[in-house]
Amino acid sequence: MIQTESTLRVADNTGAREIQCIKVIGAGQKQYANVGDVIVGTIKEATPGGVVKRGQVVRAVIVRTKRGIKRPDGSYIRFDENACVIIDENKDPRGTRIFGPVTRELREKKYMKIISLAPEVL
């Protein structure tokens, strides 16, 4: 579960390393974001020469959470870190590579470009 002030690792090659959540994009008074949800965040740590800079406000989709997700068959999938991928207005990733695994739930949310770039889909 990601909420305001949560920090996430960035799982792409845009140059950002860490994002802090400012707002969860969604319906009404939604407080928490899970895998596949879009957040607005500010870049807290970035590498020099990247596409994005420190302090820039960006949108990102969550691809991994520590809390995990319950699947319809009753199994859970959880990760060691909270991670996201920076996206543009058309919900396409701004980077050209994705690092680490992503979940199948992104397919249901129509993030096919992220699924195709990911090295592993769990």
Curated annotation (Swiss-Prot):
GO biological process, one term: translation
One GO CC term, this protein: cytosolic large ribosomal subunit
Transmembrane segments: none
Pfam families: Ribosomal_L14
SUPFAM superfamilies per record: Ribosomal protein L14
InterPro entries associated with the record: Ribosomal_uL14, Ribosomal_uL14_bac-type, Ribosomal_uL14_CS, Ribosomal_uL14_sf
Keywords assigned: Ribonucleoprotein, Ribosomal protein, RNA-binding, rRNA-binding
Role, per record: Binds to 23S rRNA. Forms part of two intersubunit bridges in the 70S ribosome.
Family classification: Belongs to the universal ribosomal protein uL14 family.
PANTHER family for the chain: 50S/60S RIBOSOMAL PROTEIN L14/L23, LARGE RIBOSOMAL SUBUNIT PROTEIN UL14M
Oligomeric form and interacting partners: Part of the 50S ribosomal subunit. Forms a cluster with proteins L3 and L19. In the 70S ribosome, L14 and L19 interact and together make contacts with the 16S rRNA in bridges B5 and B8.
Protein name per Swiss-Prot or TrEMBL: Large ribosomal subunit protein uL14
